[in-house]
Amino acid sequence: MKFLVEEGSYRYIMSGSLLGIEMKDLRSAPVGYIDIWEMYPLDLEEFFGAVGVSDTVMDHIKESWNGMKPVDEVVHAKLMSIVRLYLIVGGMPAVVEKYLETNNLQSVMEVQKAILRLYEVDIAKYDPNRKLYIREIFNLIPPELNAKNKRFILKNLNEKIKFSRYENSFIWLKDTGVALPTFSVEAPTSPLALSRSRNLFKLFQSDVGLLAATYADGIQLRILDDDPDINFGAIYENLVAQEVHCHGFDLYYFNSKKQGELDFVVEYE
């Protein structure tokens, strides 16, 4: 790569969902010749733009936020319907494109399930030694998020297994951008990293639409209709994790029997 850049005829872009893993395996990186940019699914604001929410409406939202005032009720109702749509479609570019082309949720789910199948192929291809562990963890994300405290319980994989045996599999899922670990902190005080627990965490999907695609068929329409019988906790919490992560913040949460729980704790200067 260094030679090609120095030759100067072209500029090069390398891309891939697992490029970060490949780069970490390099013995030396060509410092000064490569800029690394991490890409994310479309966030909620970008999704608003994709489905045609006008700049005027977006400005109204920002003004309301900055002035600590409620958004107009009609605007609020419309935006919440788009939020529920985002819970189903998510932000994967191919999925959003399919929705805009077809306006068909069944077509959307077909693309999402194809992406999930490709994840399994990538797991087997890039880490054959740990593929069973990684696949077990990945497949356990939806039911673990549906549990009361949403914390990932390692014993649900194997009662006798130790965290150290699975740790590299969690790291692999994080480094590939497939999953978003959110670590427990002993206290919601800065710096959060100093009180981070190594093995107490929640594990979210990197895209809320892919999480919704793992649910039973028919749930998607109930989400769109804001069905009061559905527990929206897991899917909304996944949405927040995705938003916080794509804006550059590390993911933490705080839980205390005496003080209560903070679903997310953000270190912001």
Q: For the regions a protein language model found, what residue spans apply to each?
A:
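Accessory nucleic acid-recognition modules appended to NTPase machines
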Residues: 97-268
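Structural recognition of the conserved hydrophobic beta-strand(s) that form the central parallel beta-sheet
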Residues: 11-17, 38, 47
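Conserved Walker B catalytic segment
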Residues: 1-13
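Conserved nucleotide-binding/hydrolysis micro-motifs of P-loop NTPases
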Residues: 18-22, 41-45, 186, 210
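Glycine-rich, phosphate-binding/catalytic loops in enzymes
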Residues: 2-5, 29-32, 222
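Hydrophobic/aromatic beta-strand patches that form the interior of the parallel beta-sheet core
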Residues: 13, 35-37, 87, 204, ...
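Interdomain motor-coupling "hinge/lid" segment immediately C-terminal to the ATP-binding subdomain
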Residues: 23-146
